[in-house]
Curated annotation (Swiss-Prot):
GO terms for molecular function: 4 iron, 4 sulfur cluster binding; iron ion binding. Belongs to the NfuA family. Homodimer. One of its GO terms (biological process) is iron-sulfur cluster assembly. The gene is nfuA. This is Fe/S biogenesis protein NfuA. The keyword Acyltransferase does not apply. The lineage of its organism: Bacteria, Pseudomonadati, Pseudomonadota, Gammaproteobacteria, Pseudomonadales.
């Protein structure tokens, strides 16, 4: 069973749209273009009988079937399709919090794993100070070269953040990583948090 939720309001709205198509057995197909990247977009399309793919997961709903694209399915974990009414009519919304999160495991290249932990664990904390960190490269001896930006650039606490936060977290998650190096120009203190 897929971990996507399609609310009753969304089901009713979609059933109404599908009925207007005058195609017996028509359903919807939910997929993500460029899943696991910053360009990911969650999509819903009509799916006539026979247009679904063998590897798709079928969700039998009250009035129609929703087909979930197999490649997109892990990225649709915790996704919610909803329909909210307002003065102007209503709007179908799709919230897919994992659409842009890359799927990694211990066999993934070290750069993918570093980027994954930067985006999912480290940057959310730095964002509270208006900052972020990105991977520039992985150099000899498995040293990650990083660049800070936003409120972290020029910040007086960046050395502590680098060693006690970023480096510690990355080495705990990626044992073959031996350390991190900062290549940020911290002389620009215009947006610095501290």
């Amino acid at each position: 069973m897929s971990a996507i939720t399609i609310t009753e309001a969304a089901q009713a709205y979609l059933a109404e749209l599908l009925e207007k198509q005058s195609t017996p057995g028509i359903g919807i197909r939910i997929f993500i273009t460029q899943p696991g990247t910053q360009y990911a977009e969650t999509c819903i399309a009509y799916c006539k009988p026979g247009e679904e793919k063998v590897e798709d997961t079928a969700i039998a709903l009250k009035d129609f079937t929703a087909w979930i694209d197999a490649v997109s399915e892990p990225f649709l974990e915790d996704a919610v399709v909803d329909y909210a009414t307002d003065r102007m009519g209503g709007q179908l919304t799709i919230k897919a919090p994992n659409a842009k999160v890359p799927m990694v495991n211990e066999d993934s290249p070290i750069t993918e794993r570093i980027n994954y932990y930067l985006q999912t664990e480290i940057n959310p904390g730095l964002a509270s100070h208006g900052g972020q960190v990105s991977l520039v490269d992985v150099v000899e001896d498995n040293i990650a070269v990083l660049r800070f930006g936003g409120g972290c650039q020029g910040c007086g606490m960046v050395d502590m953040t680098l060693k006690d936060g970023v480096e510690k977290t990355l080495i705990e998650r990626i044992p073959e990583l031996k350390g991190v190096r900062d290549v940020t120009d911290h002389s620009n203190k215009e947006n610095a948090y501290y």
